[in-house]
Amino acid sequence: PSANTSSSLSPTEANHVYEYFKNDKNLSIILDGGSTQIGLESTIINLDNDKIEILRHGGVSAEELKEKFPQKVINIEQKANEIIIAPGMLSKHYSPAVPLRINAKKAEKNELLIGFGPNYNAPNLSFEGSLVEAASNLFSFLAKYQKKYSKIAIAPIPNKGIGKAINDRIKRASKN
């Protein structure tokens, strides 16, 4: 995904792109290649002094990079006062139109809980607990349910593999 307006949800389907840009007179065509397979934006890295610094977690996990480039991968955790050097590093980004609560075990009043794993009912990012499936579903679920609910909560997501990218996106999306 890359056709998103600043700080809003990233589109994962052609109709999401249309909704963002339907009033833009410069947009004349949208190519529909189906839903995105990964569902999250790319991993952004900085190659510096024979090191791979992860600036933004994405579809390629730190573990996958470490497998290909042992002892060269460094995770960069952005500090509040650091300069933004890559897309998606704003503290508030990827946000739905309604409040989002993260690491929720139960829904609060007037709130939809989006689950993860076998202990949650529908809607569920992945009943099987697949982080790849959850990443693929994340933005399309948020786009769909922000139109139907005034508040959304998301169950805890393991912070490993592509789960780091999922948690990064929902943490930024939950900022007010």
Residue ranges and their predicted role:
Residues 1-176:
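Active-site-adjacent structural elements in enzyme catalytic cores
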